[in-house]
Amino acid sequence: MREKIDVHAASPGAEASRTLRIDLHVHTLASDGVSDVEAILEAAVKAGLDAIAITDHERIDAALAARAIAEGRGSPLEVIVGEEITTRGGHLVGLFLRRRIRPWHSLRSSVARIHEQGGLAIIAHPLVPYPLCASARTIRRLMDEPDPVFHPDGLEGFNPTTARMRWSRRAPAFAEEVGIAAVAGSDAHAAHHVGRAVTTFRGEAVAGLRGAIARRDTGWEGEPYTWREQVRMFGHQQRKNAAAIRDEVGGKVRRDGTGRDLGYPGGRARPARFDRTAAGLGEGERA
């Protein structure tokens, strides 16, 4: 039986018109997801979300494509360009990015790089004793830095992948202790998981997310993934990886050198590029 968690936080005097729901952690075929951008966008609309953040590992090209497609269609869904960055201190989600953040730098410098381009830095699935998860000690050390450029803006108080682990249950209280916002995202790797966990806040538009995080005025809704769902997803990812290897080996013959399809317009190339024409955009239109 699924355990649904619904936590809303709002300042008593907040003037706002409605509760907005945003999934801040979504992967596509461009990294280790198994669904293409079109399927992700469709699922987000069906889930009634106001926005999603595409946060592929170490890349933002599919996120740029998703945003351009949504805007080009006049969709009410907003797409936040993000990235899940592998740092030496654990995974870090960057939101509202303009440029890719390179992996394997320190967590401290990666947070600063996100802030330098006007983005938000969110610690992904914290506290779990695993190399890809930031420890409490590491996060406290960042928050003790005298320069706020090194301070993360928030951490995942709920991630359905790790929510059943006892360490993750401490995350909301830990966020309160160190003085940063607790948010949530589905960490979806397939379209049908989009919206499984969302960040909520009171506001009039998605642009208000920045202020809500700064005020620590966010809540979340979510359901943990079952172990069966996680095992099934691992199997899907392994089959995808096997197919990708076949495409890499056979791509020159089948596609005249274009390589594997990364699941968005213009994605059939390495290194990946965003093809404006394939997305239905002219040269003068913004991506």
Region roles according to the model:
Residues M1-A30, V34-A43, D61-R67, G74, ...:
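Charged catalytic cores and adjacent phosphate/nucleic-acid-binding surfaces used
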Residues L29, I40-D61, G119-I122:
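Divalent metal-dependent hydrolysis catalytic cores, especially in the metallo-beta-lactamase
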Residues H57, P126, P160:
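Flexible loop residues that form catalytic
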Residues L77, V81-T86, L127:
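Short glycine-enriched loops at secondary-structure junctions
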Residues R102-H105, H115, G119:
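Core dinuclear metal-dependent hydrolase active-site scaffold
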Residues I122-L132:
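Aromatic-lined carbohydrate-recognition surfaces of secreted/lumenal glycan-active proteins
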